[in-house]
Regions:
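Two-component signal transduction core modules
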Residues: 51, 82, 109-110
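Conserved phosphotransfer cores of two-component systems
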Residues: 44-46, 72-79
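Conserved acidic carboxylate
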Residues: 7-8
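Acidic, metal-coordinating helix/loop segments flanking the phosphotransfer/catalytic sites
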Residues: 34-50, 60
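Two-component/phosphorelay signaling modules centered on CheY-like receiver
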Residues: 11-32
Length: 127
């Protein structure tokens, strides 16, 4: 069974993603980080194939902090793909910066928070 770790401020959306995977035919287990401090430890323990992190305009979810966390995760789990999620309606500049991070090869994928959980699940599976 493949694993993903989700580190999101929006618990409702994280729960929706976890429920979507649980009720799907995909053989993927979702591990939710309760706090940002848990993320590194969970990645080290479970060695997920994808880490999904939400990015907002507020600490500790700012892009710079997420990219520092990405560096730490990649040092421990070099095969883990990094995906960032942002609300492109309220965080327009952050969304642009995340697109640039993808273009520059700093992350593997990005998602907008406005997409349905089922679509997000399909995109994660395809990674």
């Amino acid at each position: 069974m493949r694993k993903i770790v989700i580190d999101m401020q929006n618990y409702l959306f994280a729960d929706a993603v976890a429920a979507a995977f649980k009720s799907s035919d995909y053989d993927i287990e979702v591990i939710r980080a309760e706090s940002q401090r848990d993320t590194v430890e969970l990645c080290q323990i479970y060695e997920p194939f994808v880490l999904v992190m939400e990015v907002t305009g507020y600490a500790p979810w700012k892009l710079g902090e997420r990219l520092r966390l990405r560096d730490e995760i990649k040092a421990l789990c070099p095969n883990c793909k990094i995906a960032l999620m942002v609300d492109s309606n309220t965080e327009r500049q952050t969304a642009k910066d995340i697109r640039d991070a993808k273009k520059d090869g700093l992350i593997d994928q990005f998602f907008y928070g406005s997409m349905p959980a089922e679509y997000l699940m399909d995109q994660i599976y395809a990674m």
